[in-house]
């Protein structure tokens, strides 16, 4: 992306469309929290709160009035009462127009009640004159809460106390009781010694709350000190509802004694745990020196509640009791039970009244989030004396910590007022409740719950009157902490329910991606109609975006009950100042502060108020009229492409700028600079027309417009012959508009409406060649042929060619299309068209679309061709060939059916000529092989004297290599007889598999009777010379890729053998596969594969007698042996020479004598 593009994108992000973000008026005060809340007061003023500003000791919060006319802010004087401690004035603000009122609240007033600090609120209602003292609501802070307490005095009446001290003890008790005179405290008293006497119960005190009338008549009992038993009796009897004890009151026991217990059968370990379980808080007062001993002191610690140091008082004598009465009173007052039973420990002590504020027709409505354990609610002040508390506890008991009243809004429908309160912490998901008045009582009418834990659904509310008729149409509910991975916060758009219908939110609004902590929806306001569409627009703040720099989103009204789903613009705080923080934390709109009649927006940021002015919105209207209305045929029709530059006509272009918004601006002052571009046929690569002025198909001009119309006339030229004379020439106008600053209104600049039409088009059509009536009536006809093919063999050649011929014997045909419907086993591959005799080029035939329907058995496909679009001329004929691929697995039945339909945009009625149906017989290619197996007996021999027969077998293998299963018949031919002599005796047909087959046999005579001559010529014994058995076996299904073997077996005798010059004969059997040739076909050259034969060579031989040969051979061998022996003897072979050799050697070897 270029630097320029990045800059344009950045400007688009921050530009507020018709909110002037370039010249905002900024107010800044050095007051802590300034800008946290803002409201438009009316006139030219905005009230800005600074709730954290410390004006004096224990006084926080201030109000400022910022005026557009003076560009300055000044504090609003307010005399705050001294009890308004740290009230955070201005934390909530509200205004009303009729009458003009300002309601400012400080909901953090700190009120100290004894040892506790409570948080309440004070609000001030100003009239039109902010200098006059406002009314205060409530008129005074509530009194400190009084704790219900049931107090029992257990006094020691033993004999160790003299009468004077006993009277002092009675005076002490009376004085302490009188100090609780205006509290919610009841008293009871028991005296103990050896016996126990209840002098008055809680019921007695309730009937007569005079302490002295109960205490004065008491007489001392005297006796021993049974303190433990007295404590048990108090716990079990006096703290009982029969004696007036209250279930939720604090139970307090005050024990006054002068010594250790004595004579008591009970130990403290027997009674103190019971008192603890009953929740009795025990104070013990030890009187006298007896408790100076460690053991006695430990007894006091045992009696008292823990820690003992907080609950034990020790004085030296009864005279000193008056020194501890204030201490005892303060400790009892400090007892604040947290929560007992089902009763909340807090009612309105922590109310924070005024946390939200609205002005109703009855009076101020102040949200009270802390009431009743932060269940919340609201106070409605109809007069100074009449206050109504509104909450939902009667309907929904599970409202603890819900913060009802965190936000508030007022609804007006048919002059009936309703109230809406938000409870963002209800069950951690949030709740918004609508209240309606029923005979003076505000009751919940309907409600909406949030969806995400922690989203703070209901933290902000805004009622919207979409059409400014005085009736509320919808409520905006903010959930600023709604979390998604890439953005934070959302706003629900909730139209008001009709009748008893359920209240539902129909849409959700979000900020931009990339800001998970953006808090979108933290502030909501009505803008009014800022874009002039007569629907109310709204602004939504997201102060946490861009690391807390903040942003404001503008959403336009979409209808009377909805807003646009996406924002029209986003204004970021960083655009105004890099250091600006929390821009959009508060918003106020809907009023004209700049006296120009346009609604303005006040935006609060940390330490700043920014006033964004609305800008007037303009729209541009354009008209373009051609003269003549159509391009004449004489201009564009030609047979050859020749440059002509003919005058096509003129176009009159008129522009008018109108103001879309209602304002106080003078129409004569509004001007804008308009740059507009004209383009002829802007999307075509080859232009069909151009402007005579520019010699191009484009033209640009810039003019300054007021709120008036300007026109100009332009001449159009056609440079060439037009191929496409059906589509009109398109003239497109697009423009930019920049408003000129209005000097008299602070350089306010008009802007073009965001949804304005940015380009305009006009069409310059061509005159049609349709006769005088201007209605083209074509006369189309269509035929098809299979291009000489008489039968389609499926599984053979993979393509199928067809010829389509189309004629138009009428006028020009527009948008002519041919659609061919064909079975799903065909697939369109290509086409080729014949030549157009006019242009000497091929006709333009182009496939437009293909579709298929897979419903039912007859699934069809279709292909549509555009024929010479856009015009198929009159008296023309085109032929184009179409090639389909044929699926080898397809099944068409016994014929292929193709249907063609021709149609056009002329909308002529269909005739029989516009349809054609082509039928073509179909056969299915098969591929089967039968072969002679090697296991067949190929050779047999015999002697003339041999009379026994030999076994012979011929074996064949059958294989279906094709893609289809089919029924077949297997036929075998076996020679069984020649010259009335049996050759193959009892032939058998044996299948290798258990096939379902039916075989039948018949005997066939040879065609040749002169079998000897035949065998002499050819030594082959087959069915041409011998009688044969024809065995036919019918198989119902020969499955794809199936293989089976068949063996022909029998006995072969040799009586039939006929000698020939060849010395042998060939015995031949044969087989053949038969099938239905009307449905199936063999591919060319495969006819021999379905036939086979097996030959066995049969040869005779002679058997010779071996005895003469053996005898002759033996005698001859003996004679030959005798002759050889005689010859050797004659030669001396058998004479011994050893003796002669010994004789010759004797004289030489004799030893000497």
Curated annotation (Swiss-Prot):
Entry's Gene Ontology cellular component terms: cell surface; external side of plasma membrane; integrin alphaM-beta2 complex; membrane; membrane raft; nucleus; plasma membrane
Binding, Ca(2+) 3: 592, 596, 600
Keyword annotations: Calcium, Cell adhesion, Cell membrane, Disulfide bond, Glycoprotein, Integrin, Membrane, Metal-binding, Receptor, Repeat, Signal, Transmembrane, Transmembrane helix
InterPro entries linked to this entry: FG-GAP, Int_alpha_beta-p, Integrin_alpha, Integrin_alpha_C_CS, Integrin_alpha_Ig-like_1, Integrin_alpha_Ig-like_2, Integrin_alpha_N, Integrin_dom_sf
Glycan-modified residues: 58, 86, 391, 696, 734, 772, 801, 881, 907, 941, 980, 994, 1022, 1045, 1051, 1076
Gene Ontology BP term (one): positive regulation of mast cell differentiation
Record has Membrane as a keyword: yes
SUPFAM superfamilies documented for this protein: Integrin alpha N-terminal domain (SSF69318), Integrin domains (SSF69179), vWA-like (SSF53300)
GO MF annotation: an example: opsonin binding
Signal peptide positions on this chain: 1-16
Residue numbers binding Ca(2+) 1: 465, 467, 469, 471, 473
Subcellular location: Cell membrane; Membrane raft
Membrane topology classification: Single-pass type I membrane protein
TM region positions: 1106-1129
Top-level taxon of the source organism: Eukaryota
Motif GFFKR motif boundaries: 1132-1136
Function of the molecule: Integrin ITGAM/ITGB2 is implicated in various adhesive interactions of monocytes, macrophages and granulocytes as well as in mediating the uptake of complement-coated particles and pathogens. It is identical with CR-3, the receptor for the iC3b fragment of the third complement component. It probably recognizes the R-G-D peptide in C3b. Integrin ITGAM/ITGB2 is also a receptor for fibrinogen, factor X and ICAM1. It recognizes P1 and P2 peptides of fibrinogen gamma chain. Regulates neutrophil migration.
Domains (record comment): The integrin I-domain (insert) is a VWFA domain. Integrins with I-domains do not undergo protease cleavage.
Full protein name: Integrin alpha-M
């Amino acid at each position: 992306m270029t630097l320029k593009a990045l800059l344009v994108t950045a400007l688009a992000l921050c530009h507020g469309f018709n909110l002037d973000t370039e010249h905002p008026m900024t107010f800044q005060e050095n007051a802590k929290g300034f800008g946290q809340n803002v409201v438009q007061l009316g006139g030219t003023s905005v009230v800005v709160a600074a709730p954290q500003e410390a004006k004096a000791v224990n006084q926080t919060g201030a109000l400022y009035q910022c005026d557009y006319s003076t560009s300055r802010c000044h504090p609003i004087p307010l005399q705050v009462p001294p009890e308004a401690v740290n009230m955070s004035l201005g934390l909530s603000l509200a205004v009303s127009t009729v009458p003009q009122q300002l309601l400012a609240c400080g909901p953090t007033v700190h009120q100290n009640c004894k040892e506790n600090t409570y948080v309440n609120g004070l609000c001030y209602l100003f009239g039109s004159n902010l200098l006059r003292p406002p009314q205060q609501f409530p008129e005074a802070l509530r009194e400190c809460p009084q704790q219900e307490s049931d107090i029992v005095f257990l006094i020691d009446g033993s004999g160790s106390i003299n009468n004077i001290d006993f009277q002092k003890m009675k005076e002490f008790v009376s004085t302490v009781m009188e100090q609780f005179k205006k509290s919610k405290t009841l008293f009871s008293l028991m005296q103990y010694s050896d016996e126990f006497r209840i002098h008055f119960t809680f019921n007695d005190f309730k009937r007569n709350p005079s302490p002295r009338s109960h205490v004065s008549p008491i007489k001392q009992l005297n006796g021993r000190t049974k303190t433990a038993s007295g404590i048990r009796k108090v716990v079990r009897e006096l703290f009982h509802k029969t004696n007036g004890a209250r279930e939720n009151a604090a139970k307090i026991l005050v024990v006054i004694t002068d010594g250790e217990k004595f004579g008591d059968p009970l130990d403290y370990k027997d009674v103190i745990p019971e008192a603890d379980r009953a929740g009795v808080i025990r104070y013990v007062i030890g009187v006298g020196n007896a408790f100076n001993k460690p053991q006695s002191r430990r007894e006091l610690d045992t009696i008292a509640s823990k820690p003992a140091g907080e609950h034990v008082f020790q004085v030296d004598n009864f005279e000193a009791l008056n020194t501890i009465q204030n201490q005892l009173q303060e400790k009892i007052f400090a007892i604040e039970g947290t929560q007992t039973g089902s009763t909340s420990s807090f009612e309105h002590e922590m109310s924070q009244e005024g946390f939200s504020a609205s002005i109703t027709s009855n009076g101020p409505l102040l949200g009270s989030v802390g009431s009743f354990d932060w269940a919340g609610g609201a106070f409605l002040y109809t007069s100074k004396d009449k206050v109504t508390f509104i909450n939902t506890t009667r309907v929904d008991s599970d409202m603890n910590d819900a913060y009802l009243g965190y936000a508030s809004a007022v609804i007006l429908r048919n002059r009936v007022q309703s109230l809406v309160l938000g409870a963002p912490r209800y069950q951690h998901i949030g709740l918004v409740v609508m209240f309606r008045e029923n005979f003076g009582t505000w009751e919940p009418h309907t409600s909406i719950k949030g969806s995400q834990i922690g989203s703070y659904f209901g933290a902000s509310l805004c009622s919207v009157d979409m059409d400014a008729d005085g009736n509320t149409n919808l409520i905006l509910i903010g959930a600023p902490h709604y979390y998604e991975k890439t953005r934070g916060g959302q706003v629900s758009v909730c139209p008001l329910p009709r009748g008893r219908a359920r209240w539902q939110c129909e849409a959700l609004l979000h900020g931009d991606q990339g800001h998970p902590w953006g808090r979108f929806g933290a502030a909501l306001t009505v803008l009014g109609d800022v874009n002039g569409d007569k629907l109310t627009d709204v602004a939504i703040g997201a102060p946490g975006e861009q690391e807390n720099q903040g942003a404001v989103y503008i959403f336009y009204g979409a209808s009377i009950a909805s807003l646009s789903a996406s924002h029209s613009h986003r204004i970021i705080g960083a655009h105004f100042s890099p250091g600006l923080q929390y821009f959009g934390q508060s918003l106020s709109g809907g009023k004209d502060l700049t006296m120009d009649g346009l609604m303005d927006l006040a935006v609060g940021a940390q330490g700043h108020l920014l006033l964004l002015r609305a800008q007037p919105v303009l729209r541009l209207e354009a008209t373009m009229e051609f003269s003549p209305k159509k391009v004449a045929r004489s201009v564009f029709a030609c047979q050859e492409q020749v440059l002509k530059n003919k005058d096509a006509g003129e176009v009159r272009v008129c522009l008018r700028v109108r103001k879309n918004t209602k304002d106080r601006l003078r129409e004569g002052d509004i001007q804008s600079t308009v740059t507009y571009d004209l383009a002829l046929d802007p999307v075509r690569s080859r232009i069909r027309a151009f402007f005579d002025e520019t010699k191009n198909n484009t033209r640009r001009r810039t003019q300054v417009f007021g709120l008036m119309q300007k026109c100009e006339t332009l001449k159009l030229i056609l440079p060439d012959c037009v191929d496409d004379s059906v589509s009109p020439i398109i003239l497109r106008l697009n423009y930019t508009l920049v408003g000129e600053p209005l000097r008299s209104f602070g350089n306010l600049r008009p802007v073009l409406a965001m949804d304005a039409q940015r380009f305009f088009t006009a069409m310059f059509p061509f005159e049609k060649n349709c006769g005088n009536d201007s209605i083209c009536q074509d006369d189309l006809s269509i035929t098809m042929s299979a291009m000489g093919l008489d039968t389609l063999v499926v599984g053979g050649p993979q393509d199928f060619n067809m010829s389509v011929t189309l004629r138009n014997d009428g006028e020009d045909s527009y948008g002519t299309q041919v659609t061919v419907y064909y079975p799903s086993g065909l697939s369109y591959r290509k086409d080729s068209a014949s030549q157009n005799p006019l242009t000497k080029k091929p006709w333009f035939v182009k496939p437009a679309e293909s579709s298929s329907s897979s419903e039912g058995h007859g699934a069809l496909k279709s292909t549509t061709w555009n024929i010479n679009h856009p015009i198929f001329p009159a008296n023309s004929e085109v032929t184009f060939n179409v090639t389909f691929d044929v699926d080898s697995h397809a099944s068409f039945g016994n014929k292929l059916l193709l249907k063609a339909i021709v149609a056009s945009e002329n909308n002529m009625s269909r005739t029989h000529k516009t349809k054609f149906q082509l039928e073509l017989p179909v056969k299915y290619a098969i591929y089967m092989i039968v072969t002679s197996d090697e296991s067949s007996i190929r050779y047999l021999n015999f002697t003339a004297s041999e009379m026994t027969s030999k076994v012979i077998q011929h074996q064949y293998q059958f294989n279906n290599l094709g893609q289809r299963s089919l029924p077949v018949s297997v036929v075998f031919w076996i020679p069984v007889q020649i010259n009335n002599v049996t050759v193959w005796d009892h032939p058998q047909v044996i299948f290798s598999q258990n096939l379902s087959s039916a075989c039948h046999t018949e005997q066939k005579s040879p065609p040749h009777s002169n079998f000897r001559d035949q065998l002499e010529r050819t030594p082959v014994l087959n069915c041409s010379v011998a009688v044969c058995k024809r065995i036919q076996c019918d198989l119902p299904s020969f499955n794809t890729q199936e293989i089976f073997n068949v063996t022909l077996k029998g006995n072969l005798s040799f009586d039939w053998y006929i000698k020939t010059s060849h010395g042998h004969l060939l015995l031949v059997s044969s087989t053949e596969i038969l099938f239905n040739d009307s449905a199936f076909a063999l591919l060319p050259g495969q006819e021999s594969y379905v036939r086979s034969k097996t030959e066995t060579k049969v040869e005779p031989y002679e058997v010779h007698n071996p005895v003469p040969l053996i005898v002759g051979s033996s005698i001859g061998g003996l004679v030959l042996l005798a002759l050889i022996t005689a010859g050797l003897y004659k030669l001396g072979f058998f004479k011994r020479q050893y003796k002669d050799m010994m004789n010759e050697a004797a004289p030489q070897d004799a030893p000497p004598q």
